[in-house]
Amino acid sequence: MLFGPRTRTPAEGRFSLRYVVATALTHGSVRLAAFEPARLNDPATRALMAKVAPSVDAELDATFPRQRAARVAITARGNREELLQPTRKGDPDLPLSDNELNDKFLELASPVLGKEQAQSLLKRLWKLECD
């Protein structure tokens, strides 16, 4: 399913490389909303999924799990761009900024706690001292 074209459910979307790549290119990021039914059926994302061709990079695969790198190559209008991302955003060697951490916390906690309680909890969490 990782490389497969099917994405009918949120679970399938989370494990479909074609879907998450097409979503990132279409919407700029892959956040919680990416797995809502309306997004899973977004025509622009679906059209782009057909053009995504995932493959395993043997060199990068050999470094897993020590390193979680990814390489992406995009060809558009006859031009090819390639990028190597040696680590995932949010890993210890490429941490989220405080603002990114706040946004992620509120995005995930607000549906469960409510917006006001999530904001209140976030303020309290930032006041905790680490030992």
Regions found by a protein language model. Give the residues of each.
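Terminal-appendage/accessory-domain detector
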Residues: M1-D131
